From Swiss-Prot:
The lineage of its organism: Bacteria, Pseudomonadati, Pseudomonadota, Gammaproteobacteria, Cardiobacteriales. GO terms for cellular component: membrane; pilus; type II protein secretion system complex. One of its GO terms (biological process) is cell adhesion. Keywords: Fimbrium, Membrane, Methylation, Transmembrane, Transmembrane helix. Its main location: other. It is a single-pass membrane protein. InterPro entries: Bac_GSPG_pilin, N_methyl_site, Pilin, Pilin-like, T4P/T2SS_Core. NCBIfam families: IV_pilin_GFxxxE. This is Type IV major fimbrial protein FimA.
Length: 160
């Protein structure tokens, strides 16, 4: 009686391993790009939410230390140390490096929220910044110095 062989031959297994290797070589860089894009979008959204609180503070004539901005610490920020500013007013966020909120109470002042990516962000984002700027006409715009392929739709301007 003949015995039937079961299983795969060595050649078949080597072909499967080669196919998996090729797919992984394509998928891993694409996934890393996806992670970087999602982190930039997340920081844009997190910092963008503070615009309403800042507008309210400006309209009420409050200084930064009198305002509740509603910031929750982010693990993606932190490259530049503690928040600081040379302007009239800076919101203080204890323990959150890489976040600076500068605003003045004058009607024609330019105000900004600047977030700097820290070590927990994707390697291509370390030390890069995303900035919301409010012009004297009360219009907010987003700019960043991250690579163009990682920028969200609403933040295509180069950081000035």
């Amino acid at each position: 009686m003949k015995s039937l062989q079961k299983g795969f031959t060595l050649i078949e297994l080597m072909i499967v391993v080669a196919i998996i290797g090729i797919l992984a070589a394509i998928a891993i860089p694409q996934y890393q790009n996806y992670i970087a894009r999602s982190q930039v979008s997340r920081v844009m959204s997190e910092t963008g939410q503070m615009r309403t609180a800042i507008e309210t503070c400006l309209l009420d004539g409050k200084k930064a230390d009198e305002c509740f901005i509603g910031w929750t610490k982010s693990n993606l920020l932190g490259a530049s140390g503690s928040p600081s500013s040379s302007n009239d007013s800076t919101a203080d966020h204890p323990g959150q490096g890489g976040l600076v909120i500068d605003y003045k109470l004058e009607a024609d002042a330019t105000n900004a929220i600047t977030a700097t990516f820290g070590q927990n962000a994707a390697a291509t984002l370390h030390g890069k910044a995303l900035k919301w700027t409010r012009d004297p006409k009360a219009t907010w715009s987003c700019s960043t110095d991250v690579e163009l392929k990682f920028r969200p739709t609403g933040c295509k301007d180069d950081l000035k």
